[in-house]
Amino acid sequence: MTFDKGLVARIADALLQLRENGIRQKNVFGGRGFMDGKSAFVIAWGSGIIVKTAREEYESLMKEPGVSPFAPDGERPMSTWLVVEADAIADDPELTEWIQRGLRGVRR
């Protein structure tokens, strides 16, 4: 899977606006991952993102438009990971909200 370099830049800009320091980038699942310590919390993947969510938010977030479970093998979803389609993060505030959800997912 490739990733959208413009989306990577948008994620990096959002993290600057959130004053999140120490976040690094790494290739993950064929996309470009953003890491808090050793944990990926959001991955630019295709034209959308993959997000690590807090366990208690997973079921409700899965009901949002443009969101589906992440199943890297095509069969079994990884618990607490969601795919968010490009349309669901078209605006910067929406993208920022998903980034914050990802950060909560790895910091709990």
Can you say where each PLM-predicted feature lies in the sequence?
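Charge-dense, helix-prone N-terminal extensions
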Residues: 1-108
